Regions:
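Glycine-rich phosphate/diphosphate-binding loop of Rossmann-like nucleotide-binding domains
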Residues: 1-16
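Residues at alpha-helix caps and immediate loop-helix transition turns in enzyme cores, especially N-
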Residues: 4-8, 34, 62, 110-111
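Residue-identity detector for threonine
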Residues: 5, 24, 31-32, 93, ...
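Active-site rim loops that border cofactor/substrate pockets in soluble metabolic enzymes
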Residues: 12-47, 52-53, 60-81, 136, ...
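C-terminal functional extensions of proteins
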Residues: 43, 47-50, 55-56, 61, ...
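Helix-loop module immediately N-terminal to the HCX5R catalytic loop
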Residues: 81-89
C-alpha cells in the first residue's frame, strides 16, 4: 500500500541520508485516493468489498488497507460469482455496514451490477463517501473520437 511504501522509504532515508527516491507523482492518483477512502471509511464498516480483478495489485492493496485499518472481513470481489459466494457464506441476521470500493481499473458497469444484486437481497442505504474529488479528465485518443 502507499502507507507501507512510505514507511519503507523513511527507513531507507534514515539509513542512507543521500538516497534519492521516486517522485511521489509516480503513484497513480486513483490508487492513492482509493486507499485514503478505504482508510477513512474503515471504522464505519463491518465488511469491505473491493471490486477488482484477482490479478490487480491495486485491488489487492485495497483489501490489505481495509484489513490493516480494522476490517478483518475484507474481500476481493471480481465478478457476480464471487459476490454470490460471499453472500452465501455469511449469515447476515443483523444490520451491517458494507463498505464498497473498486480498484482503479474495475469497470463501473460491474460496480453497478453488484450494487443492484445487493439491493435485490437486502435493504440498502447507499452513502457516497467521497474523500477526494477526482476531477481529472482523460480525453479519448483522436482515433477513438
Amino acid at each position: 500500500s502507499v502507507d507501507d511504501t512510505k514507511e519503507i522509504i523513511e527507513v531507507l532515508k534514515q539509513r542512507f541520508p543521500d538516497i534519492k527516491g521516486p517522485s511521489t507523482e509516480d503513484i497513480c492518483y486513483a490508487t492513492t485516493n482509493r486507499q485514503l477512502a478505504v482508510k477513512s471509511m474503515a471504522d464505519m464498516c463491518d465488511y469491505v468489498l473491493v471490486i477488482g480483478a484477482q490479478n490487480s495489485s491495486n485491488s489487492q492493496r485495497l483489501v490489505e488497507v481495509a484489513k490493516k485499518n480494522g476490517v478483518s472481513n475484507s474481500y476481493l470481489i471480481s465478478d457476480e460469482d464471487d459476490l454470490n459466494i460471499f453472500l452465501n457464506n455469511f449469515n447476515f441476521t443483523d444490520s451491517i455496514n458494507i463498505g464498497l470500493t473498486a480498484g482503479a481499473s474495475a469497470p463501473e458497469t460491474l460496480v453497478q451490477i453488484l450494487i443492484s444484486k445487493l439491493k435485490r437481497k437486502f435493504e440498502v442505504n447507499l452513502i457516497n463517501h467521497e474523500v477526494v474529488k477526482e476531477d481529472i479528465i482523460f480525453n479519448l485518443p483522436k482515433s477513438l473520437r
